[in-house]
């Protein structure tokens, strides 16, 4: 930093120079004077900028403060007017309170206005005068006189030094320096002028320092006192109002109690009136249901029909408002309006979003109000106008009725509707679903799709108030539901839900409402049950245990375990502790999508509907939608799109779900995503799912009923694989019958679907990104067939069973003769054996297993194709042998000591090959075939040689009473549980015993 001179040093040096110019050393300090002026100028420039910003801020505060004062005054006026209105309406207590607050606000406003004015006067004005006065101008203006004096001084001293050096040179001398004393007298005038300008500059700087320092702080002190006065006066106003406020609080409590009592009386009166009108409302609803939908506007004359072509005059939207003749046509619920020029496409209006109104001023004019504008039309005469209006209204009514009732002539859509009705009927028959989940009212018809429970109409209104993030309500009778909205209802139900969510409900003083409770009681209870979860059973306290239970519930596909985790308050979108995750940081939704199959789709649905965020990404940026597209999982994709999952998110590779679907050529996923992008995705979507419906046969013989009433020893659950498939309605004319036959495939108390039956190979093959192999590797030569149902209970007519079998069968070779126990196993899976009764009902059996491919879910999502006439020529992928039951007709099975006689088995059905007339003969004449007399069962004490069988496949037990064995194990048959399941133990290891499927073994020839 250059040397500078202080003010005191400058004064001392100047005085010394003034007294003794020849002895002074001031000439050596002139450079320091100039450095000092430059430094002061830099500091002043910085201060000038800061003070300018300060002034700007103060002005902004003043402007906003005045605007605030103006708004406060308007608020005060409104309070004063409102209080006056209350006083005039015989409510003096409330009116006086409003007036007091008006006066209080007015006082505070006046104090604040005074404070703003003080700030403007005390701070803003001095700053403005300083910046426009002493600090006015740009950098360097203040030191211009000093710079001129310095320049003159330097010029004169340079000139004198030059003359002195030339004079010495003339006399033969050389001078390098000239002392100050030599030129002191000659430079006195210039030196005095330089000292004067320096002194003037320092005086101005001193004045500026006072104004921007001491004076500004003095002003801030004044403003501080003004602020103190503002707060003190405001506190006085508050203290003066405090007693009135305390009295007012007591009065308001009394007034509110009176108003609450009045409200309670009104609610009771309303409930009484509602109950009195319930009968009339039911009658009205029945009448409305029996007739077509009635539009909430005048009906058109039905004689004019729903279609019309012609010309109308349309008033233009321009400034001139001229009538323009346009060609118009009404068809299929749309009004088409042609333009004046042929090259422009006509405007097409959906009448479902329009309303037709008459024009009271012009009899031959009418208006059509759409969602974005109003069209003014004029006909040739009044009669023509009435015809056009009738056609428009009729076409709209027809389109609306078609939308409500659907197209009954489309086979596939009709099948889905029939399936939906069957599912709804079974949901209503579930335990606890005959009454409301919350109040116990009978026959609830409102479904919470995200919780799977049924409520009455009163409780459903409270559910709607909670919001869709707690409960999504749909009507079973009024709304058109898709099967995807019934997944949770089919798997949870009121009884299972309340077992968890009402586990801690106090029994002695029950707060649960009854059907006659008012809406307040219902709201308090429902809020406590669903939002606070006050009565739910809480199993886990810490978050780690909650996440572990959530992970286990998803892994084991336990919907009630998932509901328990939900009741514990776990965050369903949090990352789960999964050691073998496909990608790091997976959520429960990622895991559910990754391990889903036809039986666990409801697990995904619960997570989709009750998670706050469907767009959580893994460590590699994948969302659940990415997983769906990687695995071609269209069913989960439907659920996620219905839940509004984002389709624009890209993973770490920059791929969106649609990009993945296109790259892997997953056409179904690509189509769904394209529909969602264009806004054409239907949220009421149908999903492929193993519904396991219970179907009650209408035509049952007396023998069937007797058989159902007999106690069945060692009854086991069934394990059917019954997929409801579309596209097979060509095999029979009645599509409804096909849907009913599909529902027949399921039995009572069905066994849970086991992963060993149908493994989800999709993720193992595709998540790695490598192409799947042509055939999945297996440890044995062939894969095991699906396990047969255990102890089938429901029966089916021969005709429907025959039709159903033809729909889902695969061609087989070989004859259909009855084999003895020593025959070798069949090469191809046989047809299910017939169970013959007095009326020849057929035991329903599951369809043949779907052949495993590298993408099982993709194969299952495809609808089944109708069997062509030459079905025997179509070969499915190789399936493992599934030999028929080895029970010889003339030998009882070992251990067949039963309390009832053994029903004789009919001959097994032959292949579907039309040439096998012997096999199809008994089936085609099923209604004529008489069953043989049943043979009496022999007691277990009968000495028979033990029957030995050999395992064809590996089998892992699903239940404790079942046998686990490996391929090649020899099993000793101890008894027969039913036609498809026997009892036995491993040869040489009697401790390993249990039930085993007959189709997994073959006899060893003795």
Swiss-Prot record:
Keyword set, alphabetical order: ANK repeat, Cell membrane, Coiled coil, Cytoplasm, Golgi apparatus, GTPase activation, Membrane, Metal-binding, Phosphoprotein, Repeat, SH3 domain, Zinc
Entries under Pfam families matching the protein: Ank_2, ArfGap, BAR_3, PH, SH3_9
Domain Arf-GAP: 421-543
Coiled-coil region: 256-283, 729-752
UniProt repeat feature ANK, residue ranges: 584-616, 620-649
Phosphothreonine PTM positions: 903
Tissue-level expression: Detected in heart, brain, placenta, kidney, monocytes and pancreas.
Region span, Disordered: 288-312, 701-720, 764-916
Main location: cytoplasm
Compartments in which it is found: Cytoplasm; Golgi apparatus, Golgi stack membrane; Cell membrane
Biased composition (Polar residues): 288-300, 794-823
Modified residues (Phosphoserine): 701, 822
Membrane topology note: Peripheral membrane protein
Gene Ontology cellular-component annotations: cytosol; Golgi cisterna membrane; plasma membrane
Function text: Activates the small GTPases ARF1, ARF5 and ARF6. Regulates the formation of post-Golgi vesicles and modulates constitutive secretion. Modulates phagocytosis mediated by Fc gamma receptor and ARF6. Modulates PXN recruitment to focal contacts and cell migration.
UniProt subunit comment: Binds PXN, ARF1, ARF5, ARF6, PTK2B and SRC.
Protein name as catalogued: Arf-GAP with SH3 domain, ANK repeat and PH domain-containing protein 2
């Amino acid at each position: 930093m250059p040397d500078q001179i202080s003010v005191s040093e400058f004064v001392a040096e100047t005085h010394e120079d003034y007294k003794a110019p020849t002895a002074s050393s001031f000439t050596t300090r002139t450079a320091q004077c100039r450095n000092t002026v430059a430094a002061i100028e830099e500091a002043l420039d910085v201060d000038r900028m800061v003070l300018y910003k300060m002034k700007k801020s103060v002005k902004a505060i003043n402007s906003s403060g005045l605007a605030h004062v103006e708004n406060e005054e308007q608020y005060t006026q409104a309070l004063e007017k409102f209080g006056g209105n209350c006083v005039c309406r015989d409510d003096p207590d409330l009116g006086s309170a409003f007036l007091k607050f008006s006066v209080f606000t007015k006082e505070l406003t006046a104090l604040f206005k005074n404070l703003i004015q003080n700030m403007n006067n005390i701070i803003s004005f001095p700053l403005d005068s300083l910046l426009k006065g002493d600090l006015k101008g740009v950098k360097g203006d203040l030191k211009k006189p000093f710079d001129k004096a310095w320049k003159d001084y330097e010029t004169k001293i340079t000139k004198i030094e030059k003359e002195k050096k030339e004079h010495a040179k003339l006399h033969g001398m050389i001078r390098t320096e000239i002392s100050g004393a030599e030129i002191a007298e000659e430079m006195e005038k210039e030196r005095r002028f330089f000292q004067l300008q320096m002194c003037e500059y320092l005086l101005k700087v001193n004045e500026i320092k006072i104004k921007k320092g001491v004076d500004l702080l003095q002003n801030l002190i004044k403003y501080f006192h003004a602020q103190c006065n503002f707060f003190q006066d405001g506190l006085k106003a508050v203290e003066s109002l405090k007693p009135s406020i305390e009295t007012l609080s007591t009065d308001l409590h009394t007034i509110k109690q009176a108003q609450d009592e009045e409200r309670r009386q009104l609610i009771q009166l309303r409930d009484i009136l509602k109950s009195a009108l319930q009968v009339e409302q039911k009658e009205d609803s029945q009448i409305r249901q029996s007739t077509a939908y009635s539009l909430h506007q005048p009906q058109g004359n039905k004689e004019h029909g729903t279609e019309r072509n012609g010309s109308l005059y349309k008033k233009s939207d321009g400034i001139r408002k001229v009538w323009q003749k346009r060609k118009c046509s009404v068809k299929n619920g749309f009004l088409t309006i042609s333009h004046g020029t042929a090259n422009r496409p006509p405007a097409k209006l959906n009448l479902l979003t329009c309303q037709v109104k008459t024009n009271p001023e012009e009899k031959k004019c009418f208006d059509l109000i759409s969602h974005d504008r109003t069209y003014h039309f004029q006909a040739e005469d009044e009669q023509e106008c009435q015809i056009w209006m009738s056609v428009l209204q009729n076409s709209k009514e027809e389109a609306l009725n078609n939308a409500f009732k659907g197209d009954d002539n489309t086979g596939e859509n009709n099948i889905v509707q029939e399936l939906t009705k069957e599912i709804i009927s079974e949901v209503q028959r579930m335990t606890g679903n005959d009454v409301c989940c919350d109040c116990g009212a009978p026959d609830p018809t409102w479904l919470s799709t995200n919780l799977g429970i049924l409520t009455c109409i009163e409780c459903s209104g409270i559910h709607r108030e909670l919001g869709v993030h707690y409960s999504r309500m749909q009507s079973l009778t009024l709304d058109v539901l898709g099967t995807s909205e019934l997944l949770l209802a089919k798997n949870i139900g009121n009884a299972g839900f309340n077992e968890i969510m009402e586990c801690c409900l106090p029994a002695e003083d029950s707060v649960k409402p009854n059907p006659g409770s008012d809406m307040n009681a219902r709201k308090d209870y429902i809020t406590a049950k669903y939002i606070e979860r006050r009565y739910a059973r809480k199993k886990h306290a810490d978050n780690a245990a909650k996440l572990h239970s959530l992970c286990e519930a998803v892994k084991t596909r336990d919907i009630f375990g998932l509901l328990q985790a939900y009741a514990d308050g776990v965050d369903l979108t949090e990352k789960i502790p999964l050691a073998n995750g496909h990608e790091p940081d997976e959520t429960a939704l990622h895991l559910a999508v990754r391990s889903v199959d036809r039986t666990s789709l409801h697990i995904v649905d619960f997570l989709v509907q009750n998670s706050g965020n469907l767009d959580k990404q893994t460590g590699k940026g994948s969302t659940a939608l990415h997983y769906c597209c990687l695995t071609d999982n269209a069913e989960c994709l439907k659920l996620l799109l219905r839940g509004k999952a984002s389709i624009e998110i890209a993973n770490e590779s920059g791929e969106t779900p649609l990009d993945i679907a296109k790259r892997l050529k997953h056409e179904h996923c690509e189509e769904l995503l394209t529909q969602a992008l264009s806004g054409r995705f239907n949220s009421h979507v149908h999903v492929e799912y193993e519904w396991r419906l219970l179907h009650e046969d209408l035509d049952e013989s007396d023998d069937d009923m007797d058989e159902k009433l007999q106690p069945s020893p060692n009854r086991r659950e069934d394990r059917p694989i019954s997929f409801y498939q579309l596209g097979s309605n060509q095999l029979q004319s009645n599509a409804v019958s096909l849907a009913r036959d599909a529902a027949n495939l399921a039995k009572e108390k069905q066994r849970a679907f086991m992963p060993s039956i149908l493994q989800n190979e999709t993720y193992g093959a595709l998540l790695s990104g490598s192409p799947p192999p042509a055939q999945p590797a297996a440890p044995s030569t062939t894969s095991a067939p699906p396990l047969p149902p255990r102890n089938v209970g429901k029966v089916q007519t021969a005709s429907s069973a025959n039709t159903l079998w033809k729909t889902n069968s695969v061609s087989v070779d070989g004859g259909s003769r009855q084999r003895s126990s020593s025959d070798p196993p069949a090469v191809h899976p046989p047809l299910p054996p017939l169970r013959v009764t007095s009326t020849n009902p057929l035991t329903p059996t599951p369809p043949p297993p779907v052949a495993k491919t590298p993408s099982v879910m993709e194969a299952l999502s495809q609808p089944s194709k109708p069997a062509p006439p030459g079905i025997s020529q179509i070969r499915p992928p190789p399936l493992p042998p599934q030999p028929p039951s080895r029970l010889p007709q003339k030998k009882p099975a070992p251990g067949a000591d039963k309390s009832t006689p053994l029903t004789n088995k009919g001959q097994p059905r032959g292949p579907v090959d039309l040439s096998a007339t012997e096999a199809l003969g008994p089936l085609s004449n099923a209604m004529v075939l008489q069953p043989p007399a049943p043979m009496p069962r022999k007691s277990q004490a009968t000495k028979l040689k033990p029957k030995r069988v050999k395992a064809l496949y590996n089998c892992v037990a699903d239940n404790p009473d079942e046998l686990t064995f490996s391929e090649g194990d020899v099993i000793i048959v101890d008894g027969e549980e039913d036609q498809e399941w026997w009892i036995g133990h491993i040869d040489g290891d009697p401790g390993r015993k249990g039930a085993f499927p007959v189709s997994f073994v073959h006899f060893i020839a003795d």
